[in-house]
């Protein structure tokens, strides 16, 4: 089962990476929807990373650091793309997605 979670995690990384470097057509009709999407994407990404490693994510500092570094690198790459822009609030939304998962996951796991 861990192999499936790892595959889903890898596919999510590829999808998020592709979406991060692809030009955006027009503006969003809903204000701040991009921040919500950043939050949800990293919440789900953190969930699948947690399922795909043997240790709980809170104990795996390396995995957590990699997620945060990945979020930062996406914004760094976007800074250098003429058709995208790097935003601190996008990075903060990514971090909030990670942190919300880390906060609620242990509570949900122990209740299940």
Segments the model singles out, each with a brief description of its role:
Residues 57-72:
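Membrane-embedded alpha-helical segments that form the functional core of polytopic membrane enzymes
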Residues 1-22, 89-112:
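Terminal transmembrane helix and immediately flanking juxtamembrane interfaces
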Residues 29-35, 76-96:
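Interfacial helix-loop-helix junctions of multi-pass membrane proteins
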Residues 41-55, 97-109:
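Membrane-interfacial alpha-helical segments at the cytosolic side of multi-pass membrane proteins
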Residues 1-51, 63, 67:
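"…centered on the first transmembrane helix and the immediately adjacent amphipathic helix/loop
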Residues 22-23, 54, 82-83:
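Short helix-capping/hinge motifs at transmembrane helix termini and TM-loop junctions
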């Amino acid at each position: 089962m861990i192999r499936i979670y790892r595959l889903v995690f890898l596919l999510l990384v590829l999808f998020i990476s592709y979406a991060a470097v692809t030009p955006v057509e027009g503006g969003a009709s809903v204000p701040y929807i991009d921040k919500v999407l950043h939050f949800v994407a990293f919440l789900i990404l953190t969930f699948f990373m947690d399922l795909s490693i043997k240790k709980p994510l809170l104990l795996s500092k390396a995995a957590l650091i990699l997620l945060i570094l990945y979020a930062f690198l996406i914004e760094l790459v976007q800074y250098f793309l003429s058709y995208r822009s790097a935003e601190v609030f996008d990075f903060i939304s990514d971090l909030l997605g990670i942190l919300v998962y880390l906060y609620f996951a242990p509570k949900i796991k122990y209740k299940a």
